[in-house]
UniProtKB/Swiss-Prot annotation:
Part of the 50S ribosomal subunit. It comes from Leptospira borgpetersenii serovar Hardjo-bovis (strain JB197). Binds directly to 23S rRNA. The L1 stalk is quite mobile in the ribosome, and is involved in E site tRNA release. The gene is rplA. The keyword Coiled coil does not apply. One of its GO terms (cellular component) is large ribosomal subunit. This is Large ribosomal subunit protein uL1.
Amino acid sequence: MQRGKKYKALKEKVDSTKFFNIDQAVELAKSTSYTKFDGTVEIATKVDYKSLQNIRGTISLPHGNGKKVRVLVFCKGDKQNDAKAAGAEFVGDMDLIEKVAGGWTDFDACVATPDMMKDVGKLGPILGRKGLMPKPKAGTVTTDVAKAVNELKSGRVEYRPDKGGVVHLGVGKVSFDNAKLVENIRTVVQTLMRDKPSDAKGDYLKTFSVSPTMGVGVKVDVKELVNTSI
């Protein structure tokens, strides 16, 4: 991809041969952001494990990620009142199932009570393709719909590596205080290390970098980051 003059000028601010501590990396990454909007600060970390399909889970960012999350909840009876009170934008049962079956997916996260999953499961081709299918492991198939909605809206994100073993996550906005971004990043590291498979050998996190939506990626001293986060 052809890079513009602005990117090339900003790239000179970052020594690409150096690995920075997390505080320095966040400061540098933010200083290279050149979007006119409030860009996202993202992390990328490569995990070393033989079965990548087993690496997945959820992370609750203490300061959220700055993203507004529109939540849909499939539930019945009093649970609908609980979901609405927690702030879910869309709440219903068969009426919503029919709407989604028609191709509507104008929401960012989906929760369902266990008794709804027989019907929600039929939406697999639509919800699964967009990564919206409720899952017990992710805490989105639950009887406590209020808790699930609150967690999704307060910054809980799902993670899993791509085919190359790299986990990509947005950890906040460029406008966030550095300390809040650092705390979010340390929470990511703590969760990844906590969820590390018991038979993973050697250094589980091989590389780590921080970058803005549009800007320069900054390499992080991953060993120091892990040692000071857990």
